[in-house]
C-alpha cells in the first residue's frame, strides 16, 4: 500500500505544474518587432528608435549534460531606456527562465535587470565566460553551453532592462503552479478524505472522478 500511495503523490506533483515558452523562429527586420505570445505569457517591446530585430543565430542553453539548441535571437539593438525595453505579462506566479547573451563577446559589464512593481528581482552581468564547453561526439572543437537564468515572479507586468549595452535573448519560459492547494498523502487517504484528480480536496457533493480511500470513483 505504501508504494501505491507514493505513486499517487508523484502523479499529483507532476500534474501541478505547467509551462509557457516564447521562442523566436523567424527573421524580423529592425523596427518591425511587435511582440510574442505563448499560452498567456506575452512579450511586448518598446522600440521607438527601430533598433530591435530577430535574426538567425545558433546557441545552446542548459548544462554540460542537458542542453537545448536555439536558432533565433531577439536583438535589443542597444541599451535599455524609455525608448527601448521589453515587458513580459505574467499570467500567474512562478519561475521565469530565460536565455541571454551579450551582443558583444568581449564586454564584461553588460547586465540584465528583471524588475516588478519597481522592485529589482534579478540583476546579473552577462558574460560569455559563463558558458561551459562541451565536445560533441564527432566534433573537432568544443561548443559553448550558456546558462539558463531563473527568477521568481508574480502575476502582472515584469520589466526587462539592459542598462549598459545591447543583449540578445533566445527564449523566455514561465513555469507556474496550477493552484493545487493540498496534495494527496497516505495519511489523508487513511482518514477517508476525498480528492479530485488534480489532488485538491473536495466535499461530498463533488461530481466526476473522485479519489477516496485510495480508490477512484465516478460520481454522477
Where are these regions (language model features)?
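Terminal, low-complexity interaction segments
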Residues: 21-54, 60, 105-177
